[in-house]
Design a protein with these regions (language model features):
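C-terminal output helix
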Residues: 86, 104-113
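Two-component/phosphorelay signaling modules centered on CheY-like receiver
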Residues: 11-29, 94
Length: 123
């Protein structure tokens, strides 16, 4: 069973994403801020991180950068209500696996999760 960390400072969004993933049979942990997320990433093995761009203390891009420095093979889906092309470009430069704009289509989200986890398994 794949283990996924959901990071979003919007508690409702975090719960919705977590519930969707749990219904899909995944083991899910949640984090509501970047510092907590980084601690969890260092202490646990996650197959995938679902990471919001805009967090309270530190940006999702900073979390992405630090997480990938710790675990270069980590797979990350970044989500954002801000469809700014420069944010997406920077996330891709840092190594994000996928980037979804909020609100996102649930089928598209679930498919992105499955595709990324399947690629990780096949490597």
């Amino acid at each position: 069973m794949a283990k996924i960390l959901v990071v979003d400072d919007d508690l409702d969004m975090c719960q919705i994403i977590s519930d969707i993933l749990k219904e899909g049979g995944y083991s899910v942990n949640s984090s509501y801020n970047g510092e907590d997320a980084l601690m969890k990433i260092k202490k646990n093995h996650y197959d995938l991180i679902v990471l919001d761009y805009k967090l309270n203390e530190i940006s999702g891009l900073m979390v992405l950068e630090k997480a990938l420095q710790t675990i270069p093979s980590l797979k990350v889906i970044m989500i954002s209500a801000f469809g700014d092309k420069s944010i997406k470009a920077r996330a891709r430069e840092l190594g994000v696996s996928d980037f979804l704009d909020k609100p996102f289509d649930l089928k598209r989200f679930v498919q992105a999760v499955q595709d990324i986890l399947n690629r990780k398994t096949n490597k």
